[in-house]
Amino acid sequence: MKLNVNLPEHPYDVIIENGALANIGTWVSSLWKKQKIVLISDNHVNGLYGQKVVDQLEKVGFEVATFEFPEGEASKNLLTAENAWNFCAEFGLTRSDGIIALGGGVTGDLAGFVASTYMRGIHFLQIPTSLTAQVDSSIGGKTGINSKMAKNMIGTFTQPDGVLIDPEVLQTLGQREFREGLGEVIKCALIADKDLWNLLTDLSADDLVKKLDKIEEIIYRSCEVKRKVVVDDELDNGVRLYLNFGHTIGHAVENTAGYGKVMHGEAVAIGMVQISKIAELKGLMPKGITDQIRKMVKKFGLPDEYQPWDEELLFKALTHDKKARGRIIKTVIVPEIGTAKINEVTFEEMKDYLKK
């Protein structure tokens, strides 16, 4: 399966193919001339796939060095980025060379940020190995690192030269890590794909989580939602905000819990349920939709709440949200399953959305 992210200045393909990891050398050779490559990966994923990827790249003539960092959201910071910049410089990486991200969302965000800022920008590729990264963060060009104030506070818009998705690598994910990715899948269904919602409704949790039943179709449909939105609104000024359903509160949960304690997809699930509950009470979403969302979230083992729920700390984190404009935050609501809408909320009104 192949999707084309047809952006005017930087179009690229997203390849979805079982066993694709075995053909990385051929794929990269089709996109880049022989050059130096820095492979960026965390210690866990690098241990699983790093040497195989390096061997294939070297076999077709690339010179490769691997920058490895400690697994987890806590590593997505300025210190890790600086270490990566220095590593690239010591390896002699120039603007004609490239960076490959091999890993989950943290790796993709970090590697993309490093690539977009090193020497004012060099080429990079995404090889996502988590469900969250495959269906969401590897596509669209958002890169970033966290600060103590907010998630992804420092970042760029920089598109990759290509994305290679191998669903087979999901077999090495732990169940929590796989379920976390379903938070983003459920979001895609809610904002833009009712057929995907129906597919998730019909699937049993065991068939999907343990057997990866229908996983290629689920990845493809989720990527197609992301592709359409990114092509329509590359820089996040309009409809691309729909992809942030559940993220305003979700990012605040991640920040206040301490990065890594609540996984991103888990926080998105919590955020979708919480904002829907209050929006439904305000008459902005149809009666009963929150229960539908909560039922779907819980079906796949995702949380629908978080403790301790500290409204003051969450509100403080929300004030640094990237969707804020002045004293207004553009939140996302779902008028019906398969559609999304922007709902502008003042900071003061946002306090209502944090009430349990």
Swiss-Prot record:
The residues that the entry says bind Zn(2+) are E184, H247, H264
User: What is this enzyme's EC?
Assistant: 4.2.3.4
Q: Which CDD domains match?
A: DHQS
Under which pathway is this protein filed? Metabolic intermediate biosynthesis; chorismate biosynthesis; chorismate from D-erythrose 4-phosphate and phosphoenolpyruvate: step 2/7
Q: Which reaction does it catalyse?
A: 7-phospho-2-dehydro-3-deoxy-D-arabino-heptonate = 3-dehydroquinate + phosphate
A molecular function (GO) term = 3-dehydroquinate synthase activity
Give the similarity note.
Belongs to the sugar phosphate cyclases superfamily. Dehydroquinate synthase family.
Q: Know the name of this protein?
A: 3-dehydroquinate synthase
Q: Identify the gene encoding this protein.
A: aroB
